[in-house]
Amino acid sequence: MRFHDSILIFFSLASLYQHVHGARQVVRPKEKMTTSEEVKPWLRTVYGSQKELVTPTVIAGVTFSEKPEETPNPLKPWVSLEHDGRPKTIKPEINKGRTKKGRPDYSTYFKTVSSHTYSYEELKAHNMGPNEVFVEEEYIDEDDTYVSLNPIVRCTPNLYFNKGLAKDIRSEPFCTPYENSRWKVDKTYFVTWYTRFFTDENSGKVADKVRVHLSYVKENPVEKGNYKRDIPATFFSSEWIDNDNGLMPVEVRDEWLQDQFDRRIVVSVQPIYISDEDFDPLQYGILLYITKGSKVFKPTKEQLALDDAGITNDQWYYVALSIPTVVVVFFVFMYFFLYVNGKNRDFTDVTRKALNKKRRVLGKFSEMKKFKNMKNHKYTELPSYKKTSKQN
């Protein structure tokens, strides 16, 4: 092999090496859902003979209206909610024959109480008197035709939390979100409430329709505690929705912040039997924040304590500035008060009593209580000794 041929082979291999070294890693496309995995409508029969097509929907990773399994599975995962309203999946477990983390039991929260009064003639009970009556209470289950399609835990009074500065106010009718939660932009959160809380006092019926409002709240010290409804502050109002499941997903939008990093808002639910003029979002509303995302700095213990006390934004600066101002005003007032009343002050009585105490005559030594019983020998009774010759 000639020299120039070797050179050509060398450069060819070098260029091939550079090409291979600079190659990009193959990007594999994401696996698509197969036909069997995609959510499809399914057919069911409701109320005896009525055919109905049910279309599942996926919201924040949660599948609603999913076709139930033919055989009930006690270990089937269910969906709970974080304090801010984010969904989380709970997987039941069996430990020593007992199911842990099982689906929630709603007890009688969604049942209707029906009372029946029976007389002695109707029952003919051997232990009833002729004039006695028996009142029986019966709990009737709700219609679960549509609520059974909801995979998320429903809100009940036993899931309420405490809100307010002293944490002594129940959160009724809300279970989520918790007060002072932070909703981030482009994230979806679930607002949940106890449906039977909205019972019309006049008719005694539970509201069949409600809608959710989001309103801005100002927290400057001057305005704090003076929350009056301001119609322009309500920036989001949902359509009237069925009050069956007691929940609604909310996706936080960037335009709600109005070019700010975070905003203080209140979440409220309006039942259909209350008009817009009579509805107050702050009566039962939950206060929270919407934000662009996590802040870079980590809040200190002092900042967390201020947040728990309800001191946010620039309120702390007002409090810090007011303390020295009050002290200065107090000393100025005391100075002028003493200056004006300088000629009217007379402390002679006080000084005279103090001087008299210092000039007090002690009296005779023998009359003092402390030495009264002490026997005092005369000087002549003291022993005397004669001097010896050596002492002389």
Curated annotation (Swiss-Prot):
InterPro entries documented for this protein: Pma1
A cellular component term, taken from the record's GO annotations: endoplasmic reticulum
Cytoplasmic side: 339-392
Phenotype when the gene is knocked out: Leads to enhanced degradation of PMA1 in the vacuole.
Site label Cleavage, positions: R229, D230
Entry keyword set: Cytoplasmic vesicle, Glycoprotein, Golgi apparatus, Membrane, Signal, Transmembrane, Transmembrane helix
Modification after translation (UniProt): The precursor protein is cleaved into two polypeptide chains, PSG1-N' and PSG1-C'. The cleavage is performed in the Golgi apparatus by Ca(+)-dependent serine protease KEX2 between Arg-229 and Asp-230. PSG1-N' is highly O-mannosylated.
Residues bearing glycans: 34-36, 45, 49, 55, 57, 63, 65, 71, 80, 89, 99, 107-108, 112, 114-115, 117, 119, 148, 156, 171, 176, 181, 188, 192, 195, 199, 203, 215
Keyword Lipoprotein: no
Biological processes annotated in GO: protein maturation; protein targeting
Signal peptide residues on this chain, from the entry's feature table: 1-22
Ranges that cross the membrane: 318-338
Protein origin, superkingdom: Eukaryota
Topological domain ranges for the Lumenal compartment: 230-317
Pfam families: Psg1 (PF14610)
Assembly with partners or alone: Interacts with EXP1. PSG1-N' interacts with ERAD-related proteins involved in PMA1 quality control including EPS1, CDC48, UBX2 and SSM4. PSG1-C' interacts with the TLG1/2 SNARE complex proteins TLG1, TLG2 and VTI1.
Additional detail: Present with 606 molecules/cell in log phase SD medium.
Role summary: With EXP1, the specific cargo receptor protein for the plasma membrane ATPase PMA1, is involved in the transport and/or maturation of PMA1. EXP1 and PSG1 probably act sequentially to promote PMA1 sorting between the ER and the Golgi, with EXP1 promoting PMA1 export from the ER to the Golgi while PSG1 has a role in PMA1 maturation or quality control in the Golgi. PSG1 might also couple PMA1 sorting and maturation in the early secretory pathway with the glycosylation machinery.
Name of the protein this chain belongs to: PMA1 stabilization in the Golgi protein 1
Origin species: Saccharomyces cerevisiae (strain ATCC 204508 / S288c) (Baker's yeast)
